[in-house]
């Protein structure tokens, strides 16, 4: 199987792949701080031969969830993606954002992204293929509702585990201004 790697993270050594799409590897690409989601969008647009508002919206979400700087290309992409989200009302996003919410960088960063990212934070609780299926354009509504509810449940679990560990750290620490804690038993996703 030929593999194309699309990413924005720094590596000491890149994986063996048919192709690697990475802005930081290109001396000619003018803006290096775009995320893998934008790169994936650009590849998809090229393969489709057109721009797609839904995929554009997903690229905007990945820009926020990856905490990329909102300058230059990122700023214009997120702004346009928010416009599309507010106009189009995509089912998958509506189910995650919460009732009576408008799309903005805050709702993307605090309502939508944590629910999506929870699948990666607690991978032993989920089948990641469900999230891929969830974001298909023609997803079944019943399936989308089920997965969005599960995403909310997993995110609540992640929040509870995080709060529990934070409380444990505070209880077991000295009252210093600087606090560092390491515990091999703490789940890596929190």
Say what each PLM segment does:
Residues 1, 48-190:
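Hydrophobic helix-and-loop "lid/oligomerization" segment in the mid-to-C-terminal part
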Residues 2-6:
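Short hydrophobic alpha-helical runs that function as membrane-insertion/retention elements
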Residues 8-11, 23-26, 184-185:
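Short, ordered loop/turn segments at secondary-structure junctions
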Residues 14-65, 72-74:
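Short alpha-helices
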């Amino acid at each position: 199987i030929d593999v194309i790697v699309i990413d924005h993270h720094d590596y000491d050594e890149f994986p063996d792949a048919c192709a690697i799409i990475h802005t930081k590897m290109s001396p000619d690409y003018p803006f290096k701080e775009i995320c893998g989601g934008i790169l994936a969008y650009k590849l998809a647009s090229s393969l489709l031969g057109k721009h797609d508002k839904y995929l554009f919206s997903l690229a905007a979400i990945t820009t926020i969830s990856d905490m990329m700087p909102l300058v230059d290309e990122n700023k214009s992409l997120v702004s346009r993606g928010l416009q599309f989200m507010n106009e189009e009302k995509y089912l998958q996003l509506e189910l995650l954002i919460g009732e009576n919410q408008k799309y903005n960088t805050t709702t993307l960063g605090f309502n939508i992204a944590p629910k999506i990212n929870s699948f990666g934070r607690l991978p032993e609780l989920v089948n990641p293929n469900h999230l891929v299926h969830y974001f298909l354009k023609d997803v079944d509504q019943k399936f989308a509702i089920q997965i969005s509810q599960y995403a909310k449940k997993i995110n609540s679990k992640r929040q509870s585990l995080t709060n529990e560990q934070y409380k444990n750290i505070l209880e077991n620490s000295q009252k210093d201004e600087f606090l560092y804690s390491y515990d091999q038993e703490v789940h890596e996703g929190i």
